[in-house]
Amino acid sequence: VSANGLPQPPACGHSLVADASFHEMLPLRLVVAGAGGHAKEILELIQQQRMGQPVMYDEAPSSLARPPFCRLASHTNPPALRREFGNRGFPFVLAVGSPVSRARLYDRLVSVGGWPRSVIAGTAVVSGDAELSEGLNVMHFALISCDARIGRGSLVNARANLHHDTCVGQFCEICPGAMILGAARLGDRVRVGSGAIVLPGIRVGDDVTIGAGAVVTRNVPDGVTVKGVPAR
């Protein structure tokens, strides 16, 4: 414990996930929704920022049985969360990539008393003029530029760029290295693949998938998948 009374993380090289004593010192329990690869990255950010003591939630017991999740408290159904936390509710963070899964988990946990929190890496660059909704993941070295807007529950992954005046809808997944250029607009539940580029002013509808490395040069209607250069 430091001079100011805050718990200190274990020494460099020690697994934060495995250190139960460190978690027990954190007063707030924080539900982590998802138990896959992205959840590992979210756990690291939670622990680095001392956001709270992780409690895992995933509806697949086999996922929770794998390390590092097997070392943490966990639940597999919403009623169990309600029983544990009671009427006071609980904070949660989304820890999956898929737009559909993010939306489903968000709705399910809110329905049993959860309230969403965002996880934003300290290395991310976020403009003071950007508008960020609740329940976001903003990962390492992401850029969210001036007057950008991001809807609730979206994921901006590592080194993704949202440039000036862009608008990203709800529960979107902006994959690593993707670039959404000035004043482009994405609908809800859009997945932008790694390294893809959406050119300035382009409009992308709801439930669209943009393939990795694609360059989107024209507007995209709802519910389609586009890929290639130019994206079709």
Indicate where each model-derived feature is located:
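Short alpha-helical
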Residues: 37-40, 100-101, 131, 215
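Short loop/helix-cap segments at secondary-structure boundaries that form the rim of catalytic
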Residues: 62-69, 129, 218-221
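Short amphipathic alpha-helical segments
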Residues: 43-45, 69, 104-108, 150, ...
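Hydrophobic, well-ordered beta-alpha structural blocks that scaffold small-molecule cofactor pockets
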Residues: 2-5, 9-66, 74-83
